[in-house]
Amino acid sequence: MPIVKAKPTSAGRRFVVQVTSLELYKGRPHPALTKKLSKSGGRNNQGRITVRHCGGGHKRLYRIIDFRRDKIDVLGRVKRIEYDPNRSAHIALINYSDGEKRYIIAPKAVKVGDIITSGREAPIRDGNCLPLRNIPVGTLVHCIELKPGKGAQIARSAGSSCQLVAREGDHAMLRLRSGEIRKVPLECRATIGEVGNDGHGLRSLGKAGAMRWRGKRPTVRGVAMNPVDHPHGGGEGRTSGGRHPVSPWGVPTKGYKTRRNKRTGKFIVRRRKK
């Protein structure tokens, strides 16, 4: 996965760093596995902004991803690896032996032409999906379920994975990238290997416009606003805000705890590193 630094032919190209993927398919996605994706601009059904800094961006089609991997004991061949604008990971189009096609999150070691499958007796090979009960301790896995049959929820972004460190009773112990060790039921399924496109974090967009293409709008500092718009606003000349940093609605930020004390640590063996 070569890293390419753009030639500084203009101010907008000077700081661009791209991670090129030569194996990516250049055509359009499979039509039967896409659907319309409408934009909200961060507004709710009353037209009010509920999520700031959203809006614009290039049109997208949503790719329907198979997170359940419920084609049990059916062999599938990787037809192509594709770019997906809706996530950091790449996706793989799978041709199953019964004629069905599905998209999955593309594992790092899987390439075009490889054979993958799901099931309790599936080989321990990158891209295969098995219950945690049947996966050897020490294996790196991704796309992990939290409830059996619900579909993958953990370790789905580019380059991510978890390590199966132990089994205890009806649960497996998984070490997440954050350092957290978490219990997951043994009947939950996971895919062997790491998620591909692990160079995603090395890229540099190079200019503000590239962020606008992704549908993200600018973030304005409170001290640059008027008093009517933000608690830090106003004042003659440049000011520091004059108080502890707060949100536009007066809630303290930078370390202030806002989460309700109702969470349970029943399935968390060790908290993530701070």
Curated annotation (Swiss-Prot):
Keyword Transferase among UniProt keywords: no
Coiled-coil-forming residues are none
Biological processes annotated in GO: cytoplasmic translation
Gene Ontology CC: one annotated term: large ribosomal subunit
Q: Spell out the residue ranges making up region: Disordered.
A: 222-257
Keyword flag Ribosomal protein: yes
Q: Which UniProt keywords apply?
A: Ribonucleoprotein, Ribosomal protein, RNA-binding, rRNA-binding
Q: Which GO terms describe its molecular function?
A: rRNA binding; structural constituent of ribosome; transferase activity
Q: Which family does it belong to?
A: Belongs to the universal ribosomal protein uL2 family.
Function field:
One of the primary rRNA binding proteins. Required for association of the 30S and 50S subunits to form the 70S ribosome, for tRNA binding and peptide bond formation. It has been suggested to have peptidyltransferase activity; this is somewhat controversial. Makes several contacts with the 16S rRNA in the 70S ribosome.
Q: Which PANTHER family match?
A: LARGE RIBOSOMAL SUBUNIT PROTEIN UL2M (PTHR13691:SF5), RIBOSOMAL PROTEIN L2 (PTHR13691)
Query: What does the record note on quaternary structure?
Result: Part of the 50S ribosomal subunit. Forms a bridge to the 30S subunit in the 70S ribosome.
Please state what the protein is called. Answer: Large ribosomal subunit protein uL2
